[in-house]
Amino acid sequence: MIQKRTLWVAIPFVMMAAVMTGCSDDSDAPYTTDPVVLELTRSEKELVNQSNEFAFNLFRKIIPVPNSWSDPMPQNAIISPLSITYALGMLNNGAAGETQEQINKVLGFGNYGTDSINAFCVKMMRTAPQLDPQTKVMIANNIYLNKSYKLIPEFVQKAKTFYDATPETRDFADGKTENVINQWASDHTERMIQKVFKDGQFMPDAVSYLLNAIYFKGMWASPFEVQNTKDELFGTTTTMPMMHQTNTFGYTETTDCQVLQMPYGNGSFAMTIFLPKDYNPFQEIPTAEEWQQVNRAIRTTMVDVKLPRFETTTDTYLNYVMSEMGMPDAFDSEKANFSNFCYTPTYIGLMKQVAKIKLDEKGTEAAAVTVIDMNLTAIEPTPSQIVEFHANRPFLYVISEQQSGAVFFIGKYVGE
């Protein structure tokens, strides 16, 4: 039997920052301009919908809804499903057979070939940074290759063409590569994520590390005034700084929750917050179809908003979750088929993501790093009056691109 080697596919992070842009103008007034049109074909729109289905399914697996008060309660969490999509999309060019089919199915791309997925990824990577001159968006990919191994030329070409990732060959045993990868992560997240690996996670005998970074920096289209932030009760026992403003925002309601949509910059990106109408740790995660329904139902409404200022960091181990979602072969040293990736048989030994978010009066800053270790081998009408949206209890939030509806980040905040 051929022993398969470890391939670390590191998707180091996805970074989002919605803060004041680095310019000399001290004014808090947002600079706005009309959004660039993101033109998607019918099949590309379907790819977005399927990708969002993966996003919500993934978060549902990571943050399971408790069945009773005796079950573990949800914790603060944030993930970037889009980062995982890019990392696995790039790696899937090296997969074959059942392994490739399973990855495609989990990502929601089962009816599409890798060429369609590659074309969609490169289109989003090229277009997203152009949607709003006030908002900085970067999507970057990279590959570090152990000098002891060689990649399949066709995979290398696709990585360059569709993901702007050119393999860099290094001696993984030189004691420097881990720091090089960490520095790359730091450079592409404005230092939000400076360490990709926990102690002992970097493997000198790994075949390769594949990395993806998504960075977003902007500001609320309607910032909060710092002087209006007051300490108030969050939940039943915790006091937190609560930001406050009354303004027009996107708003709707479902039977169980209020939904607020707050735009960044010129409105190309927004945060959508799902707030249960009562304190409810059993809040369900929406499906992609429900996400579409909510976006169609949202109307501009005058809303009195209270939102906590918070920061959350999540380090999520993804091997078990992704295997449970339907791609077990990729993690199995005997079944994995990445014959189009490397001349040496490989499998995924570790897949993880580190994510971080900061939310304050100016906007939102977030980052996520995903690491995959491959081893060898019904909506109600919107009220017309001023609506109270006081997020003083656990809530779900989604950061998305508005024209396509593509989900960049999903998080849950339950308090400190």
Regions found by a protein language model. Give the residues of each.
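Short glycine-rich loop/turn motifs
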Residues: 55, 256-259, 354, 393-397
